[in-house]
C-alpha cells in the first residue's frame, strides 16, 4: 500500500498548485480571445495551446489527491484581463514564479515527506513552465519591437492549415 498524502504539506501543495494551474488555464483562454480580437492569431493559438497544457498539469496534480476536504491559504491573480502585451507579461510572471520558486519548493517538500513521484512531477512540470515563460517573453519582445508581422530575412513557419509538421518559407 502506498503512503497516504492525507494531512501532509504535500497534499496542501498539490491542491494549491492544482488550483493555480486550473486558474491559469482559464486566464490563458481569456487571453487567447483578447489576442485574437487584437489580430494576433499566432499568439492566440499559443495561449490556447498553453491553456491545454496547464489543464494536463492540473490533471496530473489532481490524480495524486485522495479526496476529502483540504484547507489551503493561497493567493492568485484576480480578474484582470488587459491587452495582449499586458497579458503576455502577466502570464510570463506567473510561469516564472511557478518554475523558479513554487514548484522546486513543492518538489523538495514532497521529497522530504517521502513522495518521490510527486517530487519528480513538480520538477518535470517546472521545465515546461520555464518554456512557457520563455515563449511568452519572446512574444513580448516581438510586440515591443514591432516584429510580430515582419521579420528580417527568410522565415520558416509552420502552417496551421496544412498537415502537422508542414513548414513554409
What do the predicted segments below correspond to?
Residues 1-168:
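Non-heme di-metal
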